[in-house]
Amino acid sequence: MNMFLWILQVLFGIYFTVVGVIHFVVPSGLHAAMGWMYDLSPGLHYISGTAEILAGLGLIIPGITKIQTRLTPLAGAGLVLVMIGAFVWHAQRGEFQNVGLNLVLGAASAFIAYGRWKLQPLPGRDG
């Protein structure tokens, strides 16, 4: 279980960190694939990008450093909240092609949070 959780943490940690960075550094040609991103208010745009970066890093760094490992399940729980917001945003706009991805990402984040909170907590110096 520990190895499976680590694989999920690294994959989703990298994914969310990259997606969060894209909120700030938008590559050319992205508008066609992620046009919805341009419709967010600037404040919400930066908040969601920052949350994704911090939570993505929070899935990986505490476990590697063994410092504040309790942050990993909290990062997973935070990503669940971000994905609930994304689900609502896309559903209200009728962008149902994005809703499935939000559900998968939210479910995986919830599993990581539960797994690192109850099933296989990370060992750490913080207890």
Functional labels for PLM-detected ranges:
Residues 1-127:
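Membrane-interface extramembranous regions
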